[in-house]
Amino acid sequence: MGSSSFLVLMVSLTLVTLVAAEGVKGGIEKAGVCPADNVRCFKSDPPQCHTDQDCLGERKCCYLHCGFKCVIPVKKLEEGGNKDEDVSGPCPEPGWEAKSPGSSSTGCPQK
């Protein structure tokens, strides 16, 4: 009887801990969606954020370019986004052009 009570107690404590940790990790999600990430990584960068609440202003915590970073989200059409915005991925670095099919640099700052 004692060992079964102990087992029930341990399982209950484990479940409570997991649920509480998930609530802390999730937080409130900010508007918009993370930009597409088409970069292949050989090694992940250390995370700069864990949730949207770690990011200032409207920035979201997104996996981009091999690690979690605070980035400006892409707006969905129903959130006032522009259908001409480039939602195929991040803006190319200066001096590079988008080469993949269907990609463009529309909506990227011109330098």
Swiss-Prot record:
Q: Which GO terms describe its cellular component?
A: extracellular region
Annotated region (Disordered) at 80-111
Query: Signal peptide span per the entry?
Result: 1-23
**Where does it live in the cell?**
Secreted
State the UniProt keywords alphabetically: Antibiotic, Antimicrobial, Disulfide bond, Protease inhibitor, Secreted, Serine protease inhibitor, Signal
**What does the record list as GO biological process?**
defense response to bacterium
**Origin, by domain of life?**
Eukaryota
Instruction: Please report any disulfide bonds recorded for this protein chain, giving both cysteine positions.
Output: C34-C62, C41-C66, C49-C61, C55-C70
- On whether Signal is a keyword of this UniProt record, the answer is yes
Any single Pfam family the record assigns to this protein: WAP
Q: Where is the WAP domain?
A: 27-74
Q: Spell out the InterPro entries in the cross-references.
A: Elafin-like_sf, WAP_dom
Q: One GO molecular function term?
A: serine-type endopeptidase inhibitor activity
Under SUPFAM superfamilies, the record lists: Elafin-like (SSF57256)
| Record's protein name | WAP four-disulfide core domain protein 12
Organism, scientific name: Chlorocebus aethiops
**Which gene name does the record give?**
WFDC12
